[in-house]
Curated annotation (Swiss-Prot):
It comes from the Bacteria. This is Ribosomal protein L11 methyltransferase. GO terms for cellular component: cytosol. One of its GO terms (molecular function) is protein-lysine N-methyltransferase activity. It comes from Haemophilus ducreyi (strain 35000HP / ATCC 700724). GO terms for biological process: methylation.
């Protein structure tokens, strides 16, 4: 069976409204694609994080009158009368199987593997974490997550306490626990991130050693041997006083979510308190690490 697809460009402001409208008039699915190869982080549960310039693609049954779809879009006021678009025929595929085939176990450092649940674990003796990829949470596919996982794998976490600041899916906290940490603490501003972390920790058998807090409920005088924060450069600089107090004396700090061009300004925010290591880059992103003096 073939399908008909309409593809049009939008801004992030209107993309979701266009998506909702296409579904209302019969689209069997709507997907978003980056129009300009702009970096974007893996969104949290319930969040649709869109690019500033987004292509919206609506898939319709082959019998659909696509001119009527175009006319309805114009009438809705969501697009201009002369909006650029493309209609094409799409051959049927097993879309779910094709999506699943794109994901394989990924190794980070020497010991750590992140595995989708439908894949066989490559090394039973390795530190294996089961997380399914999708829009709901980060699974290590983003370079900044990979940089943090590699760093954690290289530390001796035995008996240590780790704080995952901006925990999202909990992937970093869970990895730390599987790598030998005694306890991990996840902090995030989004209640859905807390829920995702709880579920993922339970699936990996470490829920009893993971404490989770919304940032507004973060305990006073909280400190850990290791603190990792994979958020954006702006918040890393703005929240530097708070993040620095979370690290015990002689403790370790790992920061990512930083473009390589932003590394110097982030380093300046922490250099007075930490002896910083050389910046590590991956693609256009980087990781900053150091020891509290």
């Amino acid at each position: 069976m073939a399908w008909l697809q309409i593809r049009l460009n939008s801004t992030d402001k209107y993309a979701e409204q266009i998506s909702d409208f296409l579904e209302e008039i019969g689209a069997v699915s709507v997907t978003f694609m980056d129009s300009q190869d702009t970096p974007i982080f893996e969104p949290l549960p319930g969040e649709t994080r869109l690019w500033g310039n987004t292509d919206v693609m609506g898939l319709f049954d082959a019998e659909t009158d696509m001119q009527a779809v175009v006319s309805a879009l114009i009438t809705s006021g969501l697009v201009t009368a002369d909006f650029a678009h493309k209609v094409e025929q799409i051959e049927d595929k097993d879309w779910e199987r094709e999506w699943m085939d794109n994901f394989h176990p990924m190794q980070f450092g020497q010991r750590l593997w992140i595995c989708p649940s439908w894949r066989e674990v490559p090394d039973e003796k390795a530190v294996n974490i089961m997380l399914d990829p999708g829009l709901a949470f980060g699974t290590g596919t983003h370079p900044t997550t990979a940089l943090c996982l590699q760093w954690l794998d290289g530390l001796d976490l035995t008996g240590k306490t780790v704080i995952d600041f901006g925990c999202g899916s909990g992937i970093l906290a869970i990895s730390a626990l599987k790598l030998g940490a005694k306890q991990a603490i996840g902090i995030d501003i989004d209640p859905q991130a807390i829920l995702a972390s709880q579920n993922n920790a339970a699936a990996n058998g470490v829920a009893d050693r993971l404490q989770l807090f919304l940032a507004k409920d973060q305990p006073q005088a909280l400190q850990a041997d290791v603190v990792v924060a994979n958020i954006l450069a702006g918040p890393l600089k703005e929240l530097a006083p708070n993040i620095m107090t979370l690290v015990k004396p002689q403790g370790y700090l790992g920061l990512s979510g930083i473009l390589a061009t932003q590394a110097q300004s982030v380093c300046q925010a922490y250099a007075a308190v930490f002896k910083l290591d050389p910046v590590v880059e991956k693609e256009e992103w980087c990781r900053i690490t150091g020891i509290k003096q």
